[in-house]
Regions:
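Polybasic, low-complexity association/targeting segments
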Residues: 1-30
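Active-site-proximal helix-loop elements at catalytic-domain edges
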Residues: 19-47
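A short glycine/serine-rich beta->alpha loop
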Residues: 22-29, 61-70, 97, 147-152
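Amphipathic alpha-helical interface segments
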Residues: 40-44, 79-82, 95-152
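Conserved mixed alpha/beta catalytic, RNA-binding, or beta-rich assembly cores of soluble enzyme
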Residues: 59, 63-64, 79-81, 85
């Protein structure tokens, strides 16, 4: 998986990002769970899949278990895929420094984009920025209000 992705031209990456964004939005509207929707969109765009990573992301959505005061699961899902493309592998735990720092740089850039676009990386703060207030997604009435406010 890793080898086929590491030498993709920058212009192709831009096309992949656009396609993944469109797919992620569609998946979020249909399935909900932003962390897994981002992963699914990126997996489908890059024609890769890792069941363990996808399953491990189950509890991330809604700012970690729907609580909302943690990092956006879509951001976490994105960073997880960076590690799949440029991994620090277990068998090279003391090595893979170039990949590790490349992934760090990509994660830093993604966080910067979130801060520029949403003013925060926290789920509740992003909801407030986009919809005027945070929502307690554990509460069915709040979940309905979240949907009515334009979330998906």
């Amino acid at each position: 998986m890793v080898d086929k992705l590491q030498n993709i031209p920058e212009e192709t990456w831009k096309e992949y990002v656009e396609k993944a964004y469109i797919l992620g939005d569609r998946y979020e509207r249909q399935y909900h769970g932003c962390g897994q929707c981002v992963l699914a969109a990126i997996f489908d765009t890059l024609d890769i899949y890792d069941e363990n990573v996808f399953c491990a992301a189950t509890g991330l959505s809604g700012g970690l278990g729907l609580i909302g005061n943690s990092t956006c699961a879509a951001l976490i899902g994105s960073v997880l895929t960076f590690g799949l493309v440029y991994p620090r592998r277990r068998e090279h735990f003391d090595g893979d420094r170039e990949n590790k720092y490349r992934t760090f740089k990509m994660a830093q850039e993604m966080q910067k984009r979130y801060l520029e676009q949403y003013g925060s990386i926290k789920c509740h703060d992003i909801h407030t920025n986009l919809m005027g207030r945070p929502f307690d997604l554990r509460d069915p009435e709040e979940r309905s209000a979240f949907e009515l406010a334009g979330a998906h």
